[in-house]
Amino acid sequence: QSGKDATIVELTNDNDGLGQYNFAYRTSDGIARQEQGALKNAGSENEAIEVQGSYTYKGVDGKDYTVTFVANENGYQPRVQS
């Protein structure tokens, strides 16, 4: 199935409004993403949001690739797996 014809087949989305959230989705063409975030050191001068997650897609070579990541005060830190 081509990307333009893909539909969302699974979706979750939660946000507590206080700095924590998570979401995930999967599409009919095999793309998937999940992410969760949380406020760290709330109320301090070191307050930051830390995000962890992953996404998966099919490359032009037909292989599935998954990128897992952390994003925080140290920047975006991805790791690719195939």
From Swiss-Prot:
Domain Chitin-binding type R&R stretches: 18-82
Q: Which domain of life is it from?
A: Eukaryota
Q: Does the keyword Methyltransferase apply?
A: no
Indicate yes or no for the key word Metal-binding. no
Gene Ontology cellular component annotations, sorted alphabetically: chitin-based extracellular matrix
Q: Which UniProt keywords apply?
A: Cuticle, Pyrrolidone carboxylic acid
| Disulphide bridges | none
Q: Tell me the leader sequence span.
A: none
Task: List the GO molecular function terms.
Answer: structural constituent of chitin-based larval cuticle
Name positions with the PTM Pyrrolidone carboxylic acid: Q1
Q: What does this protein do?
A: Component of the soft endocuticle of desert locust.
Q: What name has this protein been given in UniProt? A: Endocuticle structural glycoprotein SgAbd-5
> Which organism's genome codes for this protein?
Schistocerca gregaria (Desert locust)
